């Protein structure tokens, strides 16, 4: 079975990558708080939803597939996620900081802000320190002809499990955000 030709920088993938970033830039530059809040909620909710889906649903489906099919799925998923998820995560976090600043609740002596910061650090380390490097490794393996399917499966499944574990922290930060908005 030949490996698929992987194109990361297609028009649609760049559009998917840039849309959240451009929305954030517009919201900040226009000082449109409602739109900024929308950008934060939609990117954060999408990030959480994707991680929930990956961790709870896709992990079970992928475990049940033959290794060859699992590798094929991961090889198709990775190039899309390589651009999309960092864009979503970065925009959700940045929009959240802007919102907290605009609401004058970004106070580093506030235990809820400290807890949010700790969770954001954990999520960032997982996303940018574990998941993204694994996606780059998978992508490079695909570009080399995808001969090492075992490596692709191992790294891909690790990412699926880490995505699933992120949901715990995302639910915690959603709870903290609800406390912050209520007062």
Regions inferred by a protein language model and the residue ranges of each:
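Polytopic transmembrane helical bundles with strong interfacial aromatic enrichment
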Residues: 1-183
């Amino acid at each position: 079975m030949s490996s698929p030709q992987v194109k990361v920088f297609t028009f649609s993938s760049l559009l998917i990558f840039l849309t959240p970033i451009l929305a954030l830039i517009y919201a900040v530059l226009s000082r449109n708080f409602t739109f900024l809040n929308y950008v934060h909620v939609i990117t954060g909710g999408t990030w959480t939803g994707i991680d929930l889906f990956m961790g709870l649903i896709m992990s079970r489906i992928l475990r049940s597939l033959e290794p060859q099919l699992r590798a094929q799925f991961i090889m198709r998923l990775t190039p899309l996620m390589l651009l999309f998820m960092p864009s979503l995560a970065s925009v959700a976090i940045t929009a959240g900081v802007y919102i907290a600043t605009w609401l004058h609740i970004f106070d580093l002596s506030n235990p809820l802000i400290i807890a949010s910061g700790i969770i954001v650090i954990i999520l960032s380390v997982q996303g940018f320190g574990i998941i993204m490097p694994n996606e780059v490794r998978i992508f490079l393996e695909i570009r080399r002809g995808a001969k090492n399917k075992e490596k692709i499966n191992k790294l891909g499944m690790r990412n699926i499990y880490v995505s699933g574990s992120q949901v715990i922290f995302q639910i915690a930060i959603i709870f903290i955000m609800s406390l912050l908005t209520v007062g």
